[in-house]
Structure formats: C-alpha cells, structure tokens
Amino acid sequence: MSLLNCENSCGSSQSESDCCVAMASSCSAATKDDSVGGTASTGNLSSSFMEDIQGYDVEFDPPLESKYECPICLMALREAVQTPCGHRFCKACIIKSIRDAGHKCPVDNEILLENQLFPDNFAKREILSLMVKCPNEGCLHKMELRHLEDHQAHCEFALVDCPQCQRPFQKFHINIHILKDCPRRQVSCDNCAALVAFEDKEIHDQNCPLANVICEYCNTILIREQMPNHYDLDCPTAPIPCTFSTFGCHEKMQRNHLARHLQENTQSHMRMLAQAVHSLSLIPDSGYVSEVRNFQETIHQLEGRLVRQDHQIRELTAKMETQSTYVSELKRTIRTLEDKVAEIEAQQCNGIYIWKIGNFGMHLKCQEEEKPVVIHSPGFYTGKPGYKLCMRLHLQLPTAQRCANYISLFVHTMQGEYDSHLPWPFQGTIRLTILDQSEAPVRQNHEEIMDAKPDLLAFQRPTIPRNPKGFGYVTFMHLEALRQRTFIKDDTLLVRCEVSTRFDMGSLRREGFQPRSTDSGV
C-alpha cells in the first residue's frame, strides 16, 4: 500500500369367493409377463375408433371367441375384470351396470359389489394378443390389438380433417386435396394479386377493384375503381341532367350534348332563374333567412365568449408566471437553508466523521463492468472553528496498472466558514478507517494514519469550493479483503475519518499509532 498525493478525481380387490381363487392366481401370474409384452397405452385405445365406456369395437381375424365378449356391450373385453361368480366384463361396463341397475351380476343376478371385482390380467393379455384388421377403409394391414393404436396414428388410410374446409379425407390423399381440390384453397387474383379462397374467387372477380370493366355508355375499358368517376365526370355519352335542373329544367341528355342544349335554351333558362330569384325576394321571412339570422346571433355570442375566454387566459397566464417566480424563489431559499443545515451538521463532527456509503453493491457491479466509480463524501469540520474537509473513494478498475481492484481513499480540503481565521497550510494527522460491521466482540477495522505535508498543494488554502488535489492512499484496501469480513452490511460501507490538527496531535500518538512514511506528492 502506498500513500500518495492524488490529482483530480478519477380399486383393489378385497375379497374373492372360493370358486375364483384358481383364476385369480392364474391372472396374477400373468400380470408381470403382460406388463412387459404390452404397451401401456394399449389398454385405453383412442376413442377415434371405439368408445371409452365399452369394449373394443374392432374386427378380429379370426373372429372373436365368445368367452372374450362382454355380456353387456357384446364387444371384446376392455380392461377385463372378473366377478366372484366367474363372469367376465369390461371394467367400465360392469361398474356402470352396478351403479345404474343395482348390486347384482347382470348374468346370474348374484349379489355383486364393486370391491368384489378383480382384474383378469390373463384375459386382458390374451385379448391384446388377438389379431385385428385396421378399421380404416382401404387398409389391409393386420396386427395384434395391442399395436392397433400405434398403427392408427401412422395409417395412411386414416381419416383426417382438412385444415381449410374441415372435411375428412384419408391421410395419403390430404396433401393433394389441400393443393388441388379443396374449395377453400388459396388462389391469387389475376388482377389485384390478393389471396382468396377458390370458392370465393368468382364473387371476388365480380367486385375486384382492379378488374377491367367496360363502360355501358361509351364502351371504354377501365378498371372498376375508376368507373364511378368516369360516369360522374368524363363519360361523353353518359346521361346527365341539365345544369338548370334545380330551377325547373327537366331535360336529360348525353354529356357531349350539354353545351348545345345550354346554348339553344339560354332564354328559357334565364326565365327560370329570374322566377326563382323573384320567388325568394317575395319571402323575406322564409326559413332560410330565419336560419341565417340564427346563425349570425350564435356567431355573435360565440365571439363574445371567445373574447372573455381570452381575457381569462391572459389573467391566468400572468398569475402562473407570478407563481412560477415565487416558487423559484422558494426553491432557492430551501436550497440555501439545506446548505446551511448541512454546514451546521458538518461543524458538529469535531474532527470525527463517519461516512455511510449506501448501495455499495451497485458500485461494485459498476467496477466489475469497468465503469469508473468515484464518490465524494459530504464536507465536515475538524472542530468549531476548524478546517473543512471531505473524503473521496475510488474503486480502481480490474485493468488498472499496479492498483487493480483496490479501494483508493483520499482527503480533500474545502473552503470553510473559518478559513480566514485558521493557519495555512493545514497541519495535522488524519486516521482513515473502514469499519468492521460484524457482531464479534473484537472487531478488526482496516485503518491507516497519515501526516499532512504542508509543502503539498493538497493542504494549501483552497481557492475553489473543493481543492482538486487530494492526499491519501491509492491502494488503501484490496476488494478481496473487503469481502472476507463484514465490512459491508445492509449494502452499506462505513468509512471513518478522524482528524487531529497541530493543536491536538498528541492524542493519536498516545494511542500507539505511528504515521507511515509517505511518497512525495504531486
């Protein structure tokens, strides 16, 4: 560590009858074998080809033996169970029968409870090993029942819904259907290039705004969206009313004949116009005149309101400017008072100041990201009267030469209230300490003592609020040492500075601390 002068800041089965003990033993012996040979999902085949509450509705080859038929649904046993009276049923069928028809066997009406049913794994394995035909039309594949579901998932003859028209088609044909035959396949309009469904293309063609159409009057070919303007403004043979139709002329003619009509009927048109003007002059209190007067009165009222609103806006603007000036003065007063309070607090330190640096984890993260971290403490006084000082903490970057990942700590002199009454340059001893915040009886603080060097600029009377020259340690403490003890608590680092001027320097030496040798400052 070196002391340097620094430059500017950087439902199981419960009972069985005797007649079923042998069968139960046989079933349990077959359970392990069946669980290995079968597929776990085969017992609950997809409902796409059979109902969950009934047996297997598939075609067996050879045909299914009657001993494997459920007496209730008359299909192959699904999840076969056996009763104490020796009959076999689909598990779902017999449970539904017991709950709906009562606690009795459907075959012999013997008393039967649900907890008396036990799985017939022997029959289940036998049934799952039977050969069945694929139920999809056109597929000739045969397989064991246990493999039917897997086959169904990949069978090219299985029916799937077209994603466009929702109609079912066999899987091998669906792609051809989507591309060539589907009425909802997307096709491009030859005129506007818009994508439309094939079955809607005819309707789109009849309304496409860019389709070519022929004018019914002059046979000119235009695109559809231009046709309305063509009819209203350009078509030479479109029928239009006379310009004086409002005044009583009811003639209609082709647009290219309008000029001749106006020329030939000038006198009659003038008579119509004169009659219309004369009629208006005879009705001074007509609805139009009354409406105009109402509009004029409304406009006059609105103009008056507008003037009043303008006056109010001007008054409010003037008041706002006055208030803004007043608020600015209050803010300046508050800042002045805050500075005075801070100055008074700084004077109460009597040479011992503890600097609390919060959010220190954020500063460490910035240092790891190689962002410069330089923090200044508030000012504090060595006494009253006394010198005003502050501390500067600098987290050196990982790439810094000779001081990488170190905490640098410096002291700066500041302009204070008593500078004119104090001897300069500053002379005294400064103890810098990073406090151990652990709960241990004996705390191991990290501290250093340095003597002021009056010949350095760092201890001359400052000519600006804070002396840019500082004095302290470039390698005060390594960041690894900072993490080894509880120097950081609640994301806060505590730095203590104790200053003894030349009037009370003996106190530090009596405690046994001797200042370390220093390097010449810049």
Curated annotation (Swiss-Prot):
Cross-link (Glycyl lysine isopeptide (Lys-Gly) (interchain with G-Cter in ubiquitin)): K124, K319
Cross-link (Glycyl lysine isopeptide (Lys-Gly) (interchain with G-Cter in SUMO)): K124, K142, K453
Swiss-Prot/TrEMBL GO biological process terms: antigen processing and presentation of exogenous peptide antigen via MHC class II; antiviral innate immune response; autophagosome assembly; bone resorption; canonical NF-kappaB signal transduction; CD40 signaling pathway; cytoplasmic pattern recognition receptor signaling pathway; DNA damage response
Stretches annotated zinc finger (RING-type): 70-109
Molecular functions per Gene Ontology: histone deacetylase binding; identical protein binding; protein kinase B binding; signaling adaptor activity; tumor necrosis factor receptor binding; ubiquitin conjugating enzyme binding; ubiquitin protein ligase activity; ubiquitin-protein transferase activity
Major localisation: cytoplasm
Reaction(s) the record says it catalyses: S-ubiquitinyl-[E2 ubiquitin-conjugating enzyme]-L-cysteine + [acceptor protein]-L-lysine = [E2 ubiquitin-conjugating enzyme]-L-cysteine + N(6)-ubiquitinyl-[acceptor protein]-L-lysine
Keyword Membrane in record: no
EC numbers, comma separated: 2.3.2.27
Keywords (A to Z) from UniProt: Coiled coil, Cytoplasm, DNA damage, Immunity, Isopeptide bond, Lipid droplet, Metal-binding, Nucleus, Osteopetrosis, Repeat, Transferase, Ubl conjugation, Ubl conjugation pathway, Zinc, Zinc-finger
Pathway where it operates: Protein modification; protein ubiquitination
Post-translational modification: Sumoylated on Lys-124, Lys-142 and Lys-453 with SUMO1.
Gene3D superfamilies documented for this protein: Apoptosis, Tumor Necrosis Factor Receptor Associated Protein 2, Chain A, Zinc/RING finger domain, C3HC4 (zinc finger)
SUPFAM superfamilies hit by this protein: RING/U-box (SSF57850), TRAF domain-like (SSF49599)
Stretches the record annotates as Interaction with TAX1BP1: 1-354
ZnF start-end (TRAF-type): 150-202, 203-259
Family as reported in the entry's similarity comment: Belongs to the TNF receptor-associated factor family. A subfamily.
Domain comment quoted from the record: The coiled coil domain mediates homo- and hetero-oligomerization.
Stated name of the protein: TNF receptor-associated factor 6
Organism encoding this protein: Macaca mulatta (Rhesus macaque)
